[in-house]
């Protein structure tokens, strides 16, 4: 099998992946700020790095996968005040909702899922190191800031130079800062902050800045120098750039070897975002589409490419996934183990080892499905199911998927017992040689999104289309 190659944002190129410790991978991914339901952009990040960790394990690595939860933030505080509830009540509720969405999408839970509020002492410890090393200062307003110009390599991840940067990207300009580009490490508490929004420190009561949270959790849980750091493309700057400055400023060593970023989700060629009002929650999508359809919709696009969200694309994903399940409907896979020397498995592995190239990997699944349809070969069916399983797909009994109510069927389509009743009426019409009535019932069902397949022996199977 070829070596895994990953596009490293830091190098701006694909590189052969070489872990710091042979056979082991330590990976950190920036998770979700839990003040609302997860949207499709979150779903993409969750699925993408679920695929990465699944593949790393599939090719034999022992993986420690950390994905954090931001459970203290200005947005969280505002939402809790608006709702008249405590910060913990709000964050616990949306963490629970996130876990439900993850389970629906077939996302395996990370090995460690730290909450920012569990690591306040470690964050303060890192801030004190930065102060000792000359990178941090307490401003007149009580905030502790990072002195960006003190870090010689600032901009190495994003490719931005200090002269080209402007204040205001995710961090508002502040007259108390020594430089407008400086960012906050510790926010001084405000008089009207609610309970649970601040902690005692040598700098006074306050709470951590967003960037220091991930630096402290990553270094504490994975070590000061680890293999992979991932997140959405929008986090490349300033969040990940600031993580590097903080971590390397505190420890004096390289923070992360490989940086991976997934692309945006777009609607009509614009980034999906709350500010533009063009976003959809995972739950809104799952009211209309099966969760595996949504996962397949994400999987079949390369993780670094834009993902264009539309009903047309989701409908196409549903039709494509239906084709894969249909290939397995009448063929029982054999029980042999996956053999990576099999040609389809080799092509699949080559694709996944080429920067997690899921479009090519999915194309291999369709090649297999076509051969299963032609040959009804049990070993090919097994390969299809096994390889798809590495992508978190085709895990259900085929007929169960094909007969489920999704999309329009959920919004008032025929229930299973109604379909069976119409099939029985069609059988009766055929037995009475009333073939016109039998054809009428078939056409009526097709209009309702139900396709019939007459099997040898006189039975009839159905599926939703």
Curated annotation (Swiss-Prot):
Cofactor remark: Binds 1 zinc ion per subunit.
Motif ('HIGH' region): 32-42
Residues binding Zn(2+), per UniProt: 30, 214, 239, 243
Catalyzed reaction equations: tRNA(Cys) + L-cysteine + ATP = L-cysteinyl-tRNA(Cys) + AMP + diphosphate
Cofactor(s) the protein requires to work: Zn(2+)
Annotated EC: 6.1.1.16
GO molecular function, one term: ATP binding
Top-level taxonomic group: Bacteria
Enzyme class per UniProt: ligase
GO process annotations (BP): cysteinyl-tRNA aminoacylation
Binding site for ATP: 274
Keywords, alphabetical: Aminoacyl-tRNA synthetase, ATP-binding, Cytoplasm, Ligase, Metal-binding, Nucleotide-binding, Protein biosynthesis, Zinc
Subcellular location: Cytoplasm
Residue ranges annotated as motif 'KMSKS' region: 271-275
Keyword Ribonucleoprotein listed: no
GO cellular component: cytosol
Quaternary state and interactors: Monomer.
Family the entry assigns: Belongs to the class-I aminoacyl-tRNA synthetase family.
Protein name, as recorded: Cysteine--tRNA ligase
Native source species: Burkholderia ambifaria (strain MC40-6)
